[in-house]
């Protein structure tokens, strides 16, 4: 079982655009939480230069302000998955959900009782400059269903998504 959630990172203003994005990348890539960096990967960018590449994409398309990026967390049930399997699941999630359009860093943290993954990705597509658009309901429509399907493929338990009650 893995529960997912998505957070956004806004621009902090001032002269250092992307401060929150940089902090998120630094936090998730902490060697103490990722087996000295063994559980760190990237898609459509290089791990060591991910922040610079993301900023360059924003510059190229004139979108350096406002929303800087997004942070998805996949939290697995305690003792249900090992870090390597969590990494495989996370990598497949990123490939399917973000495709070939967004620069993303993916990591697994194994420093707590439950293994969990972090995905930090650019808000601007390096392919066409379009900003990622998260709509209300996307979690239940796309994010958690992909997570559930991947967990099912690996024999993990699932989160059941209930339809909202209407009055």
Predicted regions mapped to residue ranges:
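Short "domain-exit" segments at the C-terminal end of structured domains
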Residues: 163-167
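N-terminal nicking endonuclease/strand-transfer module with a His-rich metal-binding environment
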Residues: 1-162
């Amino acid at each position: 079982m893995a529960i997912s959630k998505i957070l956004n990172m806004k621009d902090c203003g001032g002269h250092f655009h992307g401060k929150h994005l940089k902090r998120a990348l630094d936090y998730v890539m902490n060697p103490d939480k990722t087996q000295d960096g063994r559980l760190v990967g990237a898609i459509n960018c290089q791990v060591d230069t991910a922040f610079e590449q993301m900023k360059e994409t924003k510059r190229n398309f004139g979108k350096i302000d406002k929303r800087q990026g997004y942070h998805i967390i996949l939290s697995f049930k305690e003792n249900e998955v090992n870090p390597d399997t969590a990494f495989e699941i996370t990598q497949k999630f990123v490939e399917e959900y973000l495709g070939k359009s967004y620069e993303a860093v993916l990591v697994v943290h194994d420093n707590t009782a439950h293994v969990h993954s972090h995905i930090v990705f650019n808000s601007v597509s390096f392919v066409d400059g379009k900003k990622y658009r998260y709509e209300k309901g996307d979690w239940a429509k796309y994010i958690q269903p992909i997570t559930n399907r991947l967990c099912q493929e690996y024999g993990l338990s699932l989160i059941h998504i209930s339809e909202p009650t209407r009055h």
